[in-house]
Structures are given as structure tokens and as C-alpha cells.
Amino acid sequence: MPWIQLKLNTTGNQAESLGDVLVESGAVSVTFQDTHDNPVFEPLPGETRLWGDTDVIGLYDAETDMADVVAMLECHPQIGKGFIHKIEQLEDKDWEREWMDNFHPMRFGERLWICPSWRDVPDPTAVNVMLDPGLAFGTGTHPTTALCLQWLDSLDLNGKTLIDFGCGSGILAIAALKLGAARAIGIDIDPQAIQASRDNAQRNGVSERLELYLAKDQPAELSADVVVANILAGPLRELAPLISVLPTTGGHLGLSGVLATQAAGVAQAYEDKFILDPVAEKEEWCRITGIKK
């Protein structure tokens, strides 16, 4: 069915409350979009971060009387009369099919493929991880996830243990297990991430070799041959004392979620305990790897 879209512009600190107003006016969904197409990066836990100049977009049923909606919004104290807005009719599409068509199998390194479940596996003899795109967690499309997957593909993981610190969808831990790791441990602060990792591990037949913990419940004195943390530069610096003790002597460390401009600051937090490799970059993002001294 066709839809009607109403777009308003506001500041980032007012966007969420304005979105609530659109829901009150009958919007079936509300999304936020940067007016200037600048990226917004994942906030720290408990923090909501939006752009300074934000478009708030409400989606309405095609039968909605938008004149009534506008009149209601003009009476709202946060908006008022004469507010600037844009209304347009969206063509009727099979949105689910169009969304699915955007995702294809992706290759990382020499052996590893990440494949949506509705696509044919390009190479049945390769290492294939079946993973469907979701709303919150990594699927390989982001440069930082790609950098980590390429790195894992380059390692000899046979018989090794891996810790995925900030596991999200579990994509890195699952890929490591499919690449030969004997055991993987996923840690995250978000219960939804733990559930997503569990579901994806089950789908890929590796759930018996994957242990999952909320960060507050992780066992003391964990260690592994390989540790990967694809989170953000701030947490990587703050958590360096905790992350640095996880790899065994001679073990591998891989860090990402870091902008290239932040690499030096993150590397400095780890250089005392690791022999660091040259930084690898993809687009504006980077990966820092090293060996535990």
C-alpha cells in the first residue's frame, strides 16, 4: 500500500520529543535522518546521540487526512503555526523485497563468505557463515566488521580459543569457529546482543562451542589465544587494562570500531603490552592488531 511521508527539521536535542509528537498525530513509524548526510556513530551505553541538524520523518497511512495532521501539529506548543515541513506520497513498493535485494553474499579474505539465508551460497567449498541483516548488530557491511573478518581469515585459528569482546550479532565469534577455532567466548553489555549471537550460532551449527556472557557476568581470569574487540575508540581506550590481559602471551589482539584519526590514541593505550602491526585502513575506519608480549 502507498504511504504519506511528513518531514520536519529540528535540532538533535529536540528530535526524539518531536518524534513522539508525530506518533501522537497518527504516524505509524518515525525515523531520524541527518539533514546534511553526516554519519552518526554508536553512542556509549545509556547515551542517545543525534545530529545537530536532524530531519524527523513520520510515515502515515495513505488514507490519512494530512490537513488535519498539520492543524494538530500547529496547535502543539513544541511546533506552532507556520512550521516548515514537506509532505510527499511514497510509491507503493514491496519494501521487504527491495530491502532483501540490497544484500548479497560478501567475501572476506581468501576463504570466508557471509551469506544472507535467502541467497545461494556462491562457493559451497568455502567457509560460509549464514547471517541475515538485522537492525542493531554487525553483518559484515560496515568497514570495521569487514576489517575484522579479513583479519580472522588471515589467521591460523585451528584449535584456538577466541574472545569476541562486544560480540553484537556474534558474527566474529561465529566466523572464527567456522574458520577452525575450537572454542569462542562472546561478551556484550546488551542482552539483545547475547540473544542474537545465540540464535546466529544455532543457525550456523556452532552453538555448542560458543559461550556467551553479559559483561557484568563474565568469569574472572578469562584468557584466549585470539581476542577481537570491534567496539569504539573511547571504550577501547577506557577498557585497555581489561582487554589487554585477555590474550595469552604470544596471542593475537584485533581492535576496530576506530576512525583512522583515532588510531594513534587507541594504539598508545596498548603499545606497552603488545607488539603492534601497521594500522590497516578501510574507508575512514581502521583496524589495530598486535601480538601479546
UniProtKB/Swiss-Prot annotation:
GO molecular function, one term: protein-lysine N-methyltransferase activity
Entries under Pfam families matching the protein: PrmA
Keywords: Cytoplasm, Methyltransferase, S-adenosyl-L-methionine, Transferase
Residues where S-adenosyl-L-methionine binds: 145, 166, 188, 230
Gene Ontology CC entries for this record: cytosol
InterPro entries, sorted: Ribosomal_L11_MeTrfase_PrmA, Ribosomal_PrmA_MeTrfase, SAM-dependent_MTases_sf
EC category: transferase
Entry's EC annotation: 2.1.1.-
Reactions catalysed, as given in the entry: L-lysyl-[protein] + 3 S-adenosyl-L-methionine = N(6),N(6),N(6)-trimethyl-L-lysyl-[protein] + 3 S-adenosyl-L-homocysteine + 3 H(+)
Protein's cellular compartments: Cytoplasm
Entry's Gene Ontology BP terms: methylation
Its job: Methylates ribosomal protein L11.
NCBIfam families for this protein: prmA
Family of the protein in this entry: Belongs to the methyltransferase superfamily. PrmA family.
Protein name: Ribosomal protein L11 methyltransferase
Designated gene of the protein: prmA
